[in-house]
């Protein structure tokens, strides 16, 4: 599974974890993806969609 939203294309971003001593180490920020049956180009498919697309109704749920 690639960490990418099927609707908006949001994916992983890199950043730093900063400790109390201010030492930075690399980490990944990943989107909150949920598996969902959606209508994508008029076809019902099971895709991974980020929660911001679900909340804003960019992903139309297929029933």
From Swiss-Prot:
* A matching Pfam family: Ribosomal_L28
Tell me which domain of life the UniProt entry assigns to the organism this sequence originates from.
Bacteria
Q: Name one GO biological process term.
A: translation
Whether Ribosomal protein counts among this entry's keywords is yes
Q: Does the keyword Cell wall biogenesis/degradation apply?
A: no
Matching entries from InterPro entries are given as: Bacterial_rp_bL28, Ribosomal_bL28, Ribosomal_bL28/bL31-like_sf, Ribosomal_bL28_bact-type, Ribosomal_bL28_sf
Recite the UniProt keywords alphabetically: Ribonucleoprotein, Ribosomal protein
- One GO CC annotation: ribonucleoprotein complex
The region annotated as signal peptide is none
Molecular-function annotations in GO: structural constituent of ribosome
Sorted alphabetically, which NCBIfam families does this protein's record hold?
L28
The UniProt family comment states: Belongs to the bacterial ribosomal protein bL28 family.
Q: What is this protein called?
A: Large ribosomal subunit protein bL28
């Amino acid at each position: 599974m690639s960490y990418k939203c099927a609707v908006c294309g949001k994916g992983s971003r890199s950043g730093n974890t900063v400790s109390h001593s201010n030492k930075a180490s690399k980490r990944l920020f990943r989107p909150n993806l949920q598996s969902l049956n959606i209508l994508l180009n008029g076809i019902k498919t099971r895709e991974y969609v980020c929660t911001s697309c679900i909340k804003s109704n960019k992903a139309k749920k297929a029933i």
